[in-house]
């Protein structure tokens, strides 16, 4: 089903299922003694959602090696790069900038960074997502006896609504610098909503604030990449259709938008990110599909 204004979801449907998919990938990459990332709670959460395909992914019960798009190791490499970039961004922000003691995770889904990262003392981590998603994750981890590693504060609201007011009501201080992450979020917003989100972040960001998100090549959202990933998902038993979940239409890149409103930006291409993490360069056919996509970091002077 195509996206509509005001549509809703849970962790087993629509956009919510993509959060479960990413958590399943983190669980898959966290298995074994030589795992390249460590998300000890991803499998627990995926199993609690209960979608059979993603439970099998999390447990390592699906054989991806014969897939014509990319196999198991390539899937691990991708989620390792993505997870490390956002993990390291939050960790480095707190270590390099002693004044940054608040972080905001937008569309937090099944993100467990508030529980598993080593946060500086006094850090407040705000998680924003739909109320049902927030409540589900909180309940599962609480029932398992898992406690946050920082002062975790949840903000249950759709990002298409007045989330800045809800964030401030939860204790957020816009006069203090903030570390923001928007992982796997922007393609699921209409172009105008993406611009409004970035403007809201800017309005809430004191000097010294930092932001990390993906830099998306617009043609990858509705072109061959989205179609190829949808076909791959179906080959392995998932019915997620990214071509229906991504929004069409001309889109100003987050890099361009943030630069125009005073942020200093830097983009690391996906290929460079792979090489920096010790993996070989991305195959030419995959690069042709993802275009100039990569990872964006920004600093507000």
Swiss-Prot record:
Can you tell me which residues bind S-adenosyl-L-methionine?
129, 158-159
Which GO annotations describe the biological process of this protein? methylation
Q: Which molecular-function annotation in GO is an example for this chain?
A: methyltransferase activity
Keywords attached to this Swiss-Prot or TrEMBL record, sorted alphabetically, are: Methyltransferase, S-adenosyl-L-methionine, Transferase
State its Enzyme Commission number(s): 2.1.1.-
Q: Which family does it belong to?
A: Belongs to the UPF0677 family.
PANTHER family, alphabetized: S-ADENOSYL-L-METHIONINE-DEPENDENT METHYLTRANSFERASE YKTD-RELATED (PTHR43619), S-ADENOSYL-L-METHIONINE-DEPENDENT METHYLTRANSFERASES SUPERFAMILY PROTEIN (PTHR43619:SF2)
Entry function: Exhibits S-adenosyl-L-methionine-dependent methyltransferase activity.
NCBIfam families referenced in this protein's UniProt entry, alphabetically: mthyl_TIGR00027
The molecule here is called Putative S-adenosyl-L-methionine-dependent methyltransferase Mflv_5024
Species lineage: Bacteria, Bacillati, Actinomycetota, Actinomycetes, Mycobacteriales
């Amino acid at each position: 089903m195509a996206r509509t204004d005001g549509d809703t979801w849970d962790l087993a449907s629509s956009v919510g299922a993509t959060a479960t998919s990413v958590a399943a990938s983190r669980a898959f990459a966290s298995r074994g003694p030589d795992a390249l990332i460590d998300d000890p709670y991803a499998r627990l959460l995926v199993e609690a959602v209960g979608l059979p395909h993603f439970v099998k992914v999390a447990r390592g019960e699906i054989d991806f090696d014969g897939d014509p798009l990319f196999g198991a190791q390539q899937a691990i490499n991708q989620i390792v790069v993505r997870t490390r970039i956002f993990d390291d961004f939050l960790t480095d922000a707190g270590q390099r900038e002693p004044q940054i003691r608040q972080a905001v995770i937008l569309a937090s889904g099944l993100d467990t960074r508030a529980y598993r990262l080593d946060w500086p003392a006094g850090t407040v981590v705000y998680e924003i997502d739909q109320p049902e998603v927030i409540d589900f994750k909180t309940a599962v981890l609480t029932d398992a006896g898992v406690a946050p590693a920082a002062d975790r504060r949840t903000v249950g609201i759709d990002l298409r609504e007045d989330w800045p007011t809800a964030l401030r009501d939860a204790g957020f201080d816009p006069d203090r610098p903030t570390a923001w992450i928007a992982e796997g979020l922007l393609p699921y917003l209409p172009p105008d909503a993406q611009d409004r989100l970035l403007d809201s972040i800017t309005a809430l960001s004191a000097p010294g604030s930092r932001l990390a998100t993906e830099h998306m090549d617009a043609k990858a959202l509705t072109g061959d990449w989205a179609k190829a990933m949808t076909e791959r998902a179906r080959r392995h038993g998932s019915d997620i259709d990214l071509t229906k979940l991504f929004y069409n239409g001309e889109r100003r890149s987050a890099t361009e938008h943030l630069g125009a409103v005073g942020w200093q930006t830097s983009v690391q291409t996906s290929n460079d990110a792979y090489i920096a993490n010790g993996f070989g360069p991305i195959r030419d056919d995959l690069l042709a599909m993802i275009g100039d996509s990569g990872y964006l970091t920004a600093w507000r002077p």
